Structure formats: C-alpha cells, structure tokens
Amino acid sequence: MKVTLIVILTCAAVLVLHTTAAEELEAESQLMEVGMPDTELAAVDEERLFECSVSCEIEKEGNKDCKKKKCKGGWKCKFNMCVKV
C-alpha cells in the first residue's frame, strides 16, 4: 500500500514539473515572437520620418510656412520629423 502511494505521488510530482517546464518554454517562445516586429516598427518609423520631412520641404519650396502634417497612430510632426506623442 505504501509503495503504491509513493509511486502515485512520484508520478504526480513528475507531471507537475513537466507541465511547468512546458509552460515556461511556451512563454519563452511567445516572447521571442513578440521581439520580431521591432524591425518592422523601425521601418514604419523611418517611413513616417521621410513622409513628414518631405511634406515640409515641398511646402517650404512653395514659399509657404511649413504646416506640419499630422502623423497617424499617436505621432506628430516636429522639427521635420515624426515623433511619438
């Protein structure tokens, strides 16, 4: 009877440890996936910077004051650059 109880408790402990390790691996893999879009965000930021500076340069050449273009998604034009609000 004691041997059966020890075997059951050992199996339960192994199952808990295995489940915990699997959850940790899944969390790590999700963190790795979250890190991937950073390069995509950098490309979007560069595009916003380019659009903002180009629109200001075009307005300056037309002898008009540079009206800063409103950047979308929480960004605004400042000093011919899009900056996060």
Curated annotation (Swiss-Prot):
Disulfide bonds join 52-66, 56-77, 71-82. Residues 23-48 form a propeptide. Expressed by the venom gland. The keyword Nucleotidyltransferase does not apply. Its main location: secreted. Keywords: Disulfide bond, Neurotoxin, Postsynaptic neurotoxin, Secreted, Signal, Toxin. Residues 1-22 form the signal peptide. Coiled coil: none annotated. GO terms for molecular function: toxin activity. InterPro entries: Hwtx-2-like (IPR012625). GO terms for cellular component: extracellular region; host cell postsynaptic membrane. Monomer. Neurotoxin active on both insects and mammals. Belongs to the neurotoxin 12 (Hwtx-2) family. 02 (Hwtx-2) subfamily. This is U4-theraphotoxin-Hhn1a. It comes from Cyriopagopus hainanus.
